[in-house]
Every structure is written in structure tokens, then in C-alpha cells.
A protein has these predicted regions:
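Short beta-strand segments
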Residues: 17-49, 57
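A generic local structural motif
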Residues: 7-10, 30-32, 107-108
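Short secondary-structure boundary/capping segments
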Residues: 12-13, 35, 110-112
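General secondary-structure edge motif
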Residues: 3, 16-17, 39-40, 70, ...
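Extreme N-terminal tail/first-helix region
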Residues: 1-21
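Short, structured beta-strand-loop surface elements
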Residues: 29, 50-125
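Serine/threonine-rich low-complexity intrinsically disordered regions
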Residues: 6, 40, 100-103
Length: 125
């Protein structure tokens, strides 16, 4: 397991540029496309729901996994975000990054309290 607590700047930039990343808990799950945002150099995702078979619940059960961005496959650990300040910053970052008319419904949905609690941070794994 990596002792690093933050990703290299080049990795953060690549993750920030990507609109959709593949995420996979463990090694047996398939990659699932998710929206991610970067806040203060840290990488976050938020699940639309908390289904027992979904990616969010898989990371809650098995925090180690992989992020896929283009040709990059990056080992990660997922950490549940409890800080209201960080959750609010993530909500704002979603609105800024995904600012098209077609994204509006999803951005507004991600701001709902039942989804805000589904915020995780990816750290080097």
C-alpha cells in the first residue's frame, strides 16, 4: 500500500480533465463510469444512489480499487467524506465542471442531501 496521501500533480490534472472516469472496487468488479471532481488537489466522486450492488457500496465494503482515465490505471483507496465543508465544496465543483444544460439535472440531483452523503475521496492506494 502506498504511503502517499496525495496524487502527483500530473495525475490530478489528468483526472480533473476527464469528464467520466472508470472506477472499480477490488479486482473482481467491472469498471463503472462516474463523474469526478478535484477540490484543492484532492479527487472526489459522488454516487447517485446507494444500491447494494453499486460501485459506491462496493468501495464501502472494499476500499481498495482502481481508477481508469484514458490509458491510466491508478490504484486507489476510497474514503467516505464526513466534513460538511468538503461536501459543500464538492457540490460546487460538480456545478462548475459539469455546467452544460444536459448536465443540470444531474448536478442538481447531486446537491440533494441523500446524495451528498454518498461522497467519497480517492487517495493513492
Amino acid at each position: 500500500m502506498s504511503k502517499e496521501t496525495t496524487f502527483a500533480d500530473a495525475v490530478v490534472e489528468a483526472l480533473n480533465r476527464a469528464k467520466i472516469l472508470g472506477v472499480r472496487a477490488g479486482t473482481e468488479h467491472r469498471y463503472t463510469g462516474v463523474w469526478t471532481v478535484v477540490v484543492d488537489g484532492r479527487v472526489f466522486a459522488r454516487s447517485w444512489n446507494d444500491k447494494p450492488t453499486g460501485w459506491f457500496r462496493a468501495f464501502r465494503k472494499q476500499p481498495s480499487g482502481t481508477i481508469q482515465a484514458g490509458d491510466l490505471e491508478i490504484p486507489v483507496r476510497a474514503k467516505l467524506v464526513r466534513s460538511a465543508r468538503i461536501r459543500d465544496a464538492v457540490t460546487a465543483a460538480f456545478a462548475e465542471k459539469y455546467n452544460t444544460k444536459g448536465s443540470r439535472k444531474w448536478v442538481e440531483g447531486f446537491a440533494e442531501p441523500e446524495r451528498v452523503v454518498n461522497t467519497i475521496e480517492f487517495v493513492p492506494g
